């Protein structure tokens, strides 16, 4: 039981990391979509591009890790979720692929029409991907995933709770991105873009808070136990999420943005962990599937804990170095955005394309392959134990 709970906590931690890092990337695409025409949206899009370019692919490491843990540690629940929510999952995967392709190829083409087309693919995929991810989480939280799912279910992810959580995911991504971009604009000394993204952070923060409250109220019918736990044992985390959100909005209104990145990330993390604490020990609410009775053999769970420790030791410092270099603007290929820019640019296209920045990195692929291989080894070990 302890091993299963530990692995469940690790799974939630990786989901949290993907949410606060990868979610901000999706939010950048959302603001790219809403930036306006060529001239009006030129400066915001350039800042978004310069902020995302060095780190946009690396954040998916956490998604791969989360999927490997879920598949290896809790195969029954994994199979049910992947079967019942197959359509939104495939749409989310397709969105990730199209988003990456649009982001990379818009740097490689020279025609204005193609730049606009790839920019639109990047922007719309950034909107749809978190939405469909949210509907899957909503299907789980609302108890719409059966324990023995044998076919895809449209009703599982199109109910009001799932749709609300889908919109909540989009709002949270936009909120995180706007808050992070305020700091990026400040680092470049661009006061106009600071004000620009401050307004958007305030709007996205208010919308996300309203959606969170609406979701909490909506859970009364489909998942009363989850709602009860959110207002019970998980209440401190719910309060923390609300307080951090209100503090960020207050600091933005006062023109004192120092520390808002940490507060915004903490608020989103509190929401994720509040859900996890409220749902514990159920993996699939409404069924008998729990962390303890649906987990892999003990040896497999221990192997996953060791794997996570290795990931922290090997990948953690690398991510720290990556973000440190990015924070000091040492990964930029040019001078960066230091003043409001003008001129013509394709929708969603950077003003100064940097071809090398858009290329997929080898490191992320190596890490992903390694994690999948480790998961396969753990599964093989588990099967060997059963055969003996």
Description of each model-found segment:
Residues 55-125, 224-232:
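Membrane-interface helix-loop-helix modules in multi-pass inner-membrane proteins
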Residues 267, 326-355:
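Short, highly charged, low-complexity non-transmembrane loops/tails of multi-pass membrane proteins
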Residues 1-58, 64-67:
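N-terminal signal-anchor module of multipass membrane proteins
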Residues 284-304, 350-352:
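Short, membrane-exposed interhelical loops at transmembrane-helix boundaries
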Residues 160-174, 301-316:
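Hydrophobic alpha-helical transmembrane segments
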Residues 105-260, 273-274:
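Long, contiguous internal "core" modules enriched in hydrophobic/ aromatic residues
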Residues 226-236, 294-312:
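Membrane-interface transmembrane-helix boundary segments in multi-pass integral membrane proteins
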Residues 357-388:
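Hydrophobic alpha-helical topogenic segments used for membrane insertion/localization
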């Amino acid at each position: 039981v302890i091993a299963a709970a530990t692995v469940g906590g690790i799974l939630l931690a990786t989901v949290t990391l993907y949410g606060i890092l990868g979610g901000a990337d999706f939010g950048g695409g959302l603001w790219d979509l809403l930036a306006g025409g060529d001239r009006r949206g030129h400066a915001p899009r350039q800042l978004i591009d310069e902020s995302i370019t060095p780190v946009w692919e690396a954040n998916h490491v956490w998604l791969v890790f989360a999927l490997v843990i879920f598949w290896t540690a809790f195969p029954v629940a994994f199979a049910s979720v992947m079967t019942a929510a197959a359509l939104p999952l495939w749409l989310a995967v397709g969105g990730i692929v199209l988003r990456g392709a649009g982001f990379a190829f818009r740097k490689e083409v020279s025609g204005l029409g193609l730049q606009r087309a790839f920019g639109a693919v990047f922007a719309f995929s950034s909107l749809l991907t978190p939405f469909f991810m949210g509907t899957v989480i909503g299907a789980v939280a609302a108890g719409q995933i059966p324990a023995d799912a044998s076919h895809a279910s449209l009703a599982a992810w199109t109910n009001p709770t799932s749709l609300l959580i889908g919109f909540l995911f989009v709002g949270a991504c936009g909120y995180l991105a706007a808050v992070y971009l305020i700091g990026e604009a400040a680092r470049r000394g661009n006061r106009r873009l600071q004000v620009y993204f401050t307004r958007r952070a305030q709007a996205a923060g208010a919308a996300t808070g309203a959606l969170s409250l609406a979701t909490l109220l909506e859970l009364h019918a489909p998942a009363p136990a989850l709602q009860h736990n959110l207002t019970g044992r998980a209440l401190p985390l719910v309060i923390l999420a609300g307080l951090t959100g209100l503090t960020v909005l207050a600091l933005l209104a006062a023109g004192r943005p120092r520390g808002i990145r940490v507060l915004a990330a903490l608020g989103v993390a509190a929401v994720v962990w509040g859900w996890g604490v409220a749902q514990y020990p159920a993996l699939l609410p409404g069924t008998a599937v729990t962390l303890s009775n649906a987990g892999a053999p003990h040896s497999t769970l221990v192997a996953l804990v060791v794997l996570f420790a290795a990931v922290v030791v090997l990948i953690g410092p690398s991510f720290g170095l990556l973000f440190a270099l990015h924070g000091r603007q040492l990964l930029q290929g040019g001078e960066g955005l230091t003043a409001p820019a003008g001129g013509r640019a394709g929708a969603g296209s950077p003003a100064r394309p940097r071809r090398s920045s858009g290329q997929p990195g080898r490191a992320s692929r190596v890490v992903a392959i390694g994690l999948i291989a480790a998961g396969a080894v753990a599964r093989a070990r588990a099967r060997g134990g059963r055969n003996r």
